[in-house]
Structure formats: C-alpha cells, structure tokens
Swiss-Prot record:
The lineage of its organism: Bacteria, Bacillati, Bacillota, Clostridia, Eubacteriales. Signal peptide: none annotated. GO terms for biological process: tRNA modification. The gene is rimO. [4Fe-4S] cluster 1 binds at residues 27, 63, 97. It comes from Heliobacterium modesticaldum (strain ATCC 51547 / Ice1). This is Ribosomal protein uS12 methylthiotransferase RimO. Its cofactor is [4Fe-4S] cluster. Catalyzes the methylthiolation of an aspartic acid residue of ribosomal protein uS12. It is found in: Cytoplasm.
Length: 460
C-alpha cells in the first residue's frame, strides 16, 4: 500500500513512505526556496524522488517574473497534472511567485491543482501537503515575508562542490519594469551570524564555492544594520577554512561602496567576477525605469572595478524595447556595449507586466521591433565575447573540475564563469576527480566556452 507519514484526523499515522517530486523553475533565489522545502519535507518523513512518475505528490515552484517565465510555469503545471491520470500522483501543488501574484486566477483556471502557496508560505509546506492529502484544497497565499536561516533543513540540488547562499530576500528598488517587490516583498537581510554559520556548514558538507545571491546583493545589511555590510560579510566568510571561492551575483550598481571594492580586491577568495545587471545605457530610459545609477556613474564604477580587480570578468544584462526606446536610444546601448566590452551579457526583450509603472506607459515598442533590436544587440555582443575569449589562448587558468564528458576529456569552470549562466572550460587530462582543481592551458576559444589541456597531471 502506497502512503506517507502525515496527519489524519488529528493523529499521526505511519504508512509506507510517500514520495514527493519537486520541480524548481526560475532563478537561483527560487532554487534555494525549493531546497529548503525539500529539507522540511524530508525531515517530516517524506521521500524525495527525481522521477515524476514515481511521486505521490508533485510540487512545482514557479517563476512569475516575466511573460515567458509565466508561460513556462503554466506549461509545467499542465504537464505534471497528467500524472494524476497516468501515474501515482495523488496531489499537485503549485508554489512560488506565480501564485503569489495570480492565485485567484490560477485556482479558477487550474482545478486539477490541489494547493497554491507563495514564497512566504515555504515554512508551511509540510502542513499544506498534509491538508491536501486529507482532501482539502488549499488556496491561501500569505505575505511574502519569509526569510530562511541556518537552522532550517536544506537539501542541496546543486553538485556537491558549490552552493547558493541567499543573504537577503525581497527588493525595495521598485524599478519601473519589475514586479519582484510585489511578489517577493520588502528587502530583508539575514544576520551575518546566520549566513556565516550556514556557509561553514556547507563547507563541512564539501562545497568549495559559495555564490552569494539576493534580489540586490550589494544592498545587504542596510535594513538590518543601517549601513551596507557586504564588505564586512565577505571578510567573515573568507575566514572559513576550506572555502575556496566566494562569488557575488545580482549586484546593483548604485549600491557598490568603496569599502566593498577594496574588500573584493584584498580578499583572494573573492572571484574576479561580478554579476552587475545594468538594464540600459540611455539616461532618460534609466530615469523613467527608476534606475538610480546614470550612464556616467556606471562608467566610473566599471573603470574602478577593472582598475582595482585586474582580470575581472563582468556579467551584465540589458533590456531592449523598453517603453520609449527610440532607435537613437537603442543605438546608445549598442555604442555602450562596444565601448565597455563586457565579458558576458544577457539580452532580454522587454516584457510588459501588470501592476508595474512601465506597463502603464503609452509609448510601448512593437514586438517586431523588440525582436529586431534583440538580434542586433546579440550579434554585436557575440563578436565582443569571442574577441575577449580569444585573448585567453595561451594563458593558464585554475579550473574547478565538474564533469568527465568522455574518457580523458573534462569540463569545468574558472573563477571567470558562474555555474548555469556562463560557459565552461573543456580540457584534456588524466585521472581527474569531480571537485578537484586543475591548471589548464587554453588552446582554443568559442563565443562562450574555452578549450585547453591540463598542465599539472597527477603523478607527473
């Protein structure tokens, strides 16, 4: 008899372990929420499974940031719902940002879903599952004010050698195009002690790289301590024995302090890499979108970062087709790309979102114009990226080994590549283990990846 450990009419009944499969969509911040839910469910006695067809409970943690993410979430829900007809599935639950913004509409349109809950309801996941298994449909979405800490169980879904550490949640920036403050709530920082304790625990479990994430990582501490405290946090994390790399993701340009730049320059464990979403290069558009850093300020910041951090790899992102973007303003973006020569760039077409200031503007750009500008920007950046990649030919990089793709052929990353969003380094070598380090001489380059050969073979 299939079953689980769950509450039934006020009693706790132990039945054969019930299996749960969780699908996580969207950003790394959402992924951490998924990992916390996995920890809570496993602690409550459920068995986690990677096979949807074996699961008695299916849960999808959705993204609701832009239209393509919403469409992917809906499609995933519909695909999982089929297992209620063909598999063991007894319950389908939908979590995350999509129900936070659209729970009522979703409940009406998706009767096959047994529960909807938001990011603020993560701590209640076990009770929500129990309610559903008792036959009660759960449609209550709470305030998005949850903030996990080091005391909560967490099951890592990343490879054993790296993990995301969410140092804050929510956002107070209120960019004109973005619905995140409505979906994730106000900005709120974890305590330094909690972050350090969690990171130390992760290192004890084998991770060598901690990726610091938040909606606005550089704003860390301002709500809790009354000042920006990312520089101090870096110093404390760097003191953890066994931690090799600290990587900064989702850095807001106007919140970079001189102290942070100096901390990055002084601490060898901080990767010479920064993720710095800039969104556009026209001052009028930046102001209309409530971005607080102008183009000249951004230029100064990038020059300072490159001066203080030689070899720095900069990842950024831009939005084409923002309301009011004329051909002249778009050309400023192209000129800026050519001038600044960023290592890695994500180009996105503007997605008109409900309940955002930009979504209410009249001067929307036609979809075909957005697509045409997207392709022009991508072609330019690909040329820039290839040129930068080719500059590494003949040089040696320290590489974290992540995969053996064939006998004698390995794949990994240097400090210049973040997992999942950037390329990789493929190299020839012998007897390498996942999670080990290799010095690799670069012999070839493509737009996104590097190729090479190990020069420090074991036993030589």
């Amino acid at each position: 008899m299939d079953g689980a450990l769950f509450l039934l009419r006020g009693r706790t009944e132990a039945i054969l372990t019930m299996k749960i499969h969780i699908t996580s969509l969207g950003c790394a911040k959402n992924r951490v929420d998924t990992e916390v839910m996995m920890g809570l469910l496993r602690e409550a006695g459920y068995e986690l499974t990677q096979r949807e067809e074996d699961a008695h409970v299916l849960l999808v943690n959705t993204c609701g940031f832009i239209l393509p993410a919403k469409e992917e979430s809906i499609q995933t829900i519909l695909e999982l719902a089929r297992y209620k007809e063909t598999g063991r599935c007894r319950a389908l639950l939908v979590a995350g940002c999509l129900p936070q913004g659209y729970a009522g509409e979703l409940a009406a349109e998706l009767p096959e879903v047994d529960a909807f809950f938001g990011p603020g309801d993560v701590p209640r996941v076990t009770s929500i599952v129990a309610e559903v298994l008792r036959g009660k449909r759960s449609l209550e979405v709470g305030k998005p004010d949850f903030l996990y800490d080091h005391t909560m169980p967490r099951v890592l879904s990343t490879p054993f050698h790296y993990a995301y550490v969410k140092i804050a949640d929510g956002c107070d920036n209120r960019c004109g195009y973005c619905a995140i403050p409505n979906l994730r709530g106000r900005f709120r920082s974890r305590s330094e002690e909690s972050i350090v304790e969690e990171t130390r625990s992760l290192v004890d479990r084998g991770i060598q790289e901690a990726l610091l994430i938040a909606q606005d990582t550089t704003c860390y501490g301002v709500d809790r301590y009354g000042e920006f405290r990312l520089a101090q946090l870096i110093g404390k994390l760097a003191s953890i024995d066994g931690l090799r790399w600290i990587r900064l993701m989702y850095c807001y340009p106007s919140h970079f302090t001189p102290e942070l730049i100096e901390a990055m320059a002084a601490e060898p464990k901080v990767c010479r890499y920064v993720d710095l979403p800039l969104q556009h290069a026209d001052d009028e558009l930046l102001r209309s979108m409530n971005r607080h850093a102008g183009v000249d300020e951004i230029r100064r910041l990038i020059r300072t970062l490159r001066e203080r951090l030689p070899g720095l790899a900069i990842r950024t992102s831009f939005i084409v087709g923002l309301p009011g973007e004329t051909e002249e303003k778009f050309q400023r973006l192209l000129d800026f790309l050519a001038e600044m020569r960023f290592d890695r760039v994500g180009i996105f077409t503007y997605s008109r979102e409900e309940n955002t200031p930009a979504g209410k503007l009249a001067d929307q750009v036609p979809e075909e114009v957005k697509e045409e500008r997207y392709h022009r920007a991508m072609v330019l950046q690909q040329e820039i990226s290839l040129s930068i990649q080719q500059e590494w030919i003949g040089k040696t990089l320290e590489v974290l080994v992540e995969e053996e793709v064939a006998p004698g052929l390995y794949r990994g990353r240097s400090e210049r590549e973040a997992p999942e969003v950037d390329g990789h380094i493929e190299f020839k070598g012998r007897h390498r283990m996942i999670g080990e380090w290799a010095n690799v001489r670069i012999t070839a380059a493509s737009h996104y990846d590097l190729m090479g050969e190990a020069i420090d073979e074991p036993g030589e």
